[in-house]
């Protein structure tokens, strides 16, 4: 059995790490490189960095901090933010990123996924999906440009359909960002993640809702995800990554120590 992964997420805005609740009201939580180094030292399996306003503001993730992170940590990391071309992706990988993630740009141009996969291989292409549960229609819908509240818009895609589409086009992993759960620390959306797991033949990373160690256990056991991403519980030192891994191992979950 492949070991499950613990993945701290660092949302970046104006050169700082920030965190919001349900993708709104972001507050500064720290500097990029020291936080990355701290999580690597605690035992994170990899890191994800989102330049959250890049796509909405039509720019690409800032490469200067990418190279500084690469110099300081020895675990894989993924970067996202406004990546729309092969050249932009190549530059970020050259600066030290191990994977690149695309979200809003892929919704604008789905062919970007297959072009990136053809150029760099499936293994380093991650697709982020911002999924919102719409109670009125009892359905999961994909939103775009979520890093800027004023620019956020609903797309024509239902989450399940987009999950299938991005796999057909060649993505290597999917991060499902459950917007309703984001930052509230009430637990992962097991129901939605389990539904997506049935459709997902590539590694699936759960994002949104972690508040306790049991939430991590439950999402691994019940939704059978490959990795669990979290932000605020790590930023605010509510959960220590090393202690979390010891707990999960004691619960019988295969985890890298």
Swiss-Prot record:
The keyword ATP-binding does not apply. GO terms for cellular component: cytoplasm. The keyword Lyase applies. CDD domains: HisF. One of its GO terms (biological process) is L-histidine biosynthetic process. Keywords: Amino-acid biosynthesis, Cytoplasm, Histidine biosynthesis, Lyase. Pfam families: His_biosynth. GO terms for molecular function: imidazoleglycerol-phosphate synthase activity; lyase activity. Pathway: Amino-acid biosynthesis; L-histidine biosynthesis; L-histidine from 5-phospho-alpha-D-ribose 1-diphosphate: step 5/9. It is found in: Cytoplasm. InterPro entries: Aldolase_TIM (IPR013785), His_biosynth (IPR006062), HisF (IPR004651), IGPS_HisA/HisF (IPR050064), RibuloseP-bd_barrel (IPR011060). The active site is at residues 11, 130. It catalyses: 5-[(5-phospho-1-deoxy-D-ribulos-1-ylimino)methylamino]-1-(5-phospho-beta-D-ribosyl)imidazole-4-carboxamide + L-glutamine = D-erythro-1-(imidazol-4-yl)glycerol 3-phosphate + 5-amino-1-(5-phospho-beta-D-ribosyl)imidazole-4-carboxamide + L-glutamate + H(+). Its EC number is 4.3.2.10. Belongs to the HisA/HisF family. Heterodimer of HisH and HisF. IGPS catalyzes the conversion of PRFAR and glutamine to IGP, AICAR and glutamate. The HisF subunit catalyzes the cyclization activity that produces IGP and AICAR from PRFAR using the ammonia provided by the HisH subunit. This is Imidazole glycerol phosphate synthase subunit HisF. It comes from Shewanella sp. (strain ANA-3). The gene is hisF.
């Amino acid at each position: 059995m492949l070991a499950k992964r613990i993945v701290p997420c660092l949302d970046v805005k104006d050169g700082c790490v920030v965190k919001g609740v349900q993708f709104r009201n972001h507050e500064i939580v720290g500097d990029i490189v020291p936080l990355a180094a701290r999580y690597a030292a605690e035992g994170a399996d990899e890191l994800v960095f989102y330049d959250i306003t890049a796509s909405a503001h039509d720019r690409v993730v800032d490469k200067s901090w990418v190279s500084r992170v690469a110099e300081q940590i020895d675990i894989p990391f993924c970067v996202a933010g406004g990546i729309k071309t092969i050249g932009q992706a190549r530059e970020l990988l050259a600066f030290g990123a191990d994977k690149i993630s695309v979200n809003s740009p892929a919704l604008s141009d789905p062919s970007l996924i297959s072009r990136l996969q053809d150029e760099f291989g499936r293994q380093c292409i991650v697709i982020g999906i911002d999924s919102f549960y719409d109670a009125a229609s009892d359905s999961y819908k994909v939103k775009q440009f979520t890093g800027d509240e004023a620019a956020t818009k609903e797309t024509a895609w239902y989450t399940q359909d987009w999950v299938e589409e991005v796999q057909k086009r060649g993505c290597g992993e999917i991060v499902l960002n459950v917007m309703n759960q984001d930052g509230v620390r009430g637990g992962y959306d097991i129901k939605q993640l389990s539904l997506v797991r049935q459709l997902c033949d590539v590694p699936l990373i759960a994002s949104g809702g972690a508040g306790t160690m049991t939430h991590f256990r439950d999402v691994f056991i019940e939704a059978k995800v490959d990795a669990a991403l979290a932000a605020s519980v790590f930023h605010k030192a509510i959960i220590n990554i090393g202690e979390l891994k010891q707990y999960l191992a004691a619960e019988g979950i295969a985890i890298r120590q």
